[in-house]
């Protein structure tokens, strides 16, 4: 039998207690309250991060509308609460100043040009209600406006006269700006945008001249669109403008679309840029006036200068109505492409100087030479602010003053020559 080696007392001996684990909780005494369960610790809130994961510190943003509790009148407060974002612009205009000196009078012609442009838009919209841009109906629609529409004759006359006055004001504004050297640094782009506005305005005059579809306008357009043919690529452009080899009903519709759609849109864009530059850059005094003490003070642009500008607008409107009533433009007779051209065909007065130069250059290649001279002269005139380095340094530049006088003399003398030949002494 195998020997039993186990200790008989081994089954009854108590087991030794295990040593306590450091940090372990002790058992609660009998009857003692159970300790509260420890809530799990919340993780720390992550720092504010952008969607890309870049940390951005919190920003204390002010009330987006600090004027909502304004104590102004009810109407003013209502508008101020909704258009408060414009307040910085209004404050800027309140602090904007215009220098006063003996030549300040010339500052108002730019505003008059803008006023007559607004008149053009308003009267043009009224005329559009009745005008029909077709070869068969254009002239008769003018007769209807003139004779049947209430005050239609007055609207047409105001539209015609405001177009001429607008161009006249722009010429005066351009030359007064030139001789005061207001184009100098940093106003170069102000001059360039003004020159572009003048060119677009002349385009208004050229495209609107044909719209009555009378005999004089028809043959003047025929002659005027012949001139660019001598230039390289000119024949192609003329055919696009005319809608064919000759002036026809297609030409009328194309002139109409240019006059009421394309040119107004371009003028609005350039005019917005021009007026913005005027506000940002301010009004310039002639060279040396500040140093010589010739500036008598400054007018607040708002409301003082604008109030004076408004007085000029009222005077301009009175002159416009007087001319429209006392010196009405005639309608003439309906255009007949098969009839011979009448005696004394000429463009509008603002093209007379160029028209006279074309007449003077009757030799072979003369028309092309005249076009080249017009183009070079226009480019040089537009780039004057960049060419006149002395004016940019606040120094007088007599050479450019002489250049401006020569240009003005060319325009005035040739304009008078056409007036003398075609108005005063036109053979009957």
From Swiss-Prot:
Give the span(s) annotated as Disordered: 1-67
Alphabetical GO biological process terms: respiratory electron transport chain
Additional detail = Heme 1 (or BL or b562) is low-potential and absorbs at about 562 nm, and heme 2 (or BH or b566) is high-potential and absorbs at about 566 nm.
Taxonomic source organism = Chlorobaculum tepidum (strain ATCC 49652 / DSM 12025 / NBRC 103806 / TLS)
> Per the record, a Pfam family?
Cytochrom_B_C
> Any idea what job this protein has?
Component of the green S-bacteria bc complex, which consists of the Rieske protein and cytochrome b subunit but appears to lack a cytochrome c1-equivalent. This complex has a comparatively low redox potential.
Q: Which UniProt keywords apply?
A: Cell inner membrane, Cell membrane, Electron transport, Heme, Iron, Membrane, Metal-binding, Respiratory chain, Transmembrane, Transmembrane helix, Transport
What GO molecular-function term can you cite, just one? metal ion binding
What subcellular compartments does it reside in? Cell inner membrane
Which superkingdom does the taxonomy of this entry point to?
A: Bacteria
Q: How does it sit in the membrane?
A: Multi-pass membrane protein
Q: What is this protein called?
A: Cytochrome bc complex cytochrome b subunit
Example of a GO cellular component annotation carried by this entry:
plasma membrane
């Amino acid at each position: 039998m195998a020997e039993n080696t186990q200790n008989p007392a081994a089954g009854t001996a108590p087991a030794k207690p295990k040593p306590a684990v450091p940090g372990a909780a002790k058992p609660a005494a009998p009857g003692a309250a159970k300790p509260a369960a420890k809530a799990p610790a919340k993780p720390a809130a992550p720092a504010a991060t952008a969607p890309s994961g870049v940390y951005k510190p919190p920003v204390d943003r002010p009330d987006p509308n600090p004027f909502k509790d304004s104590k102004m009148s009810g109407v003013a407060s209502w508008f101020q609460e909704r258009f408060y974002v414009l307040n910085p612009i209004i404050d800027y205009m309140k602090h904007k100043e215009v220098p006063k000196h003996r030549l300040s009078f010339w500052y108002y012609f730019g505003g008059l040009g803008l006023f007559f442009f607004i008149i053009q838009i308003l009267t043009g919209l009224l005329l559009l209600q009745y005008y029909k841009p077709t070869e068969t109906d254009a002239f008769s629609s003018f007769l209807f406006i003139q004779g049947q529409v209430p005050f239609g004759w007055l609207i047409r006359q105001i539209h015609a006269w405001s177009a001429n006055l607008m161009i006249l004001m722009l010429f005066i504004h351009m030359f007064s700006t030139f001789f005061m050297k207001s184009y100098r640094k940093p106003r170069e782009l102000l001059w360039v945008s003004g020159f572009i506005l003048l060119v677009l305005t002349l385009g208004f005059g050229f495209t609107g001249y044909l719209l009555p579809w009378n005999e004089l306008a028809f043959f003047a357009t025929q002659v005027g669109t012949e001139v660019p043919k001598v230039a390289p690529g000119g024949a192609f452009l003329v055919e696009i403008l005319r809608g064919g080899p000759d002036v026809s009903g297609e030409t009328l519709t194309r002139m109409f679309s240019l006059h009421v759609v394309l040119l107004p849109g371009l003028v609005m864009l350039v005019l917005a840029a021009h007026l913005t530059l005027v506000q940002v850059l301010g009004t310039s005094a002639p060279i040396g006036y500040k140093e010589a003490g010739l500036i008598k003070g400054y007018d607040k642009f708002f409301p003082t200068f604008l109030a004076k500008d408004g007085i000029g607008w009222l005077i301009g409107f009175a002159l416009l109505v007087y001319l429209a009533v006392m010196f009405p433009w005639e309608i003439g007779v309906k255009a007949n492409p098969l009839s011979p051209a009448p005696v004394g065909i000429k463009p509008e007065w603002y093209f007379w100087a160029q028209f006279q130069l074309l007449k003077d250059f009757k030799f072979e290649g003369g028309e092309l030479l005249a076009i080249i001279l017009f183009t070079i002269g226009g480019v040089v005139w537009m780039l004057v602010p960049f060419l006149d380095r002395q004016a940019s340094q606040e120094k007088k530049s007599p050479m450019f003053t002489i250049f401006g006088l020569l240009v003005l003399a060319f325009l005035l003398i040739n304009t008078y020559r056409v007036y003398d030949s075609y108005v005063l002494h036109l053979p009957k």
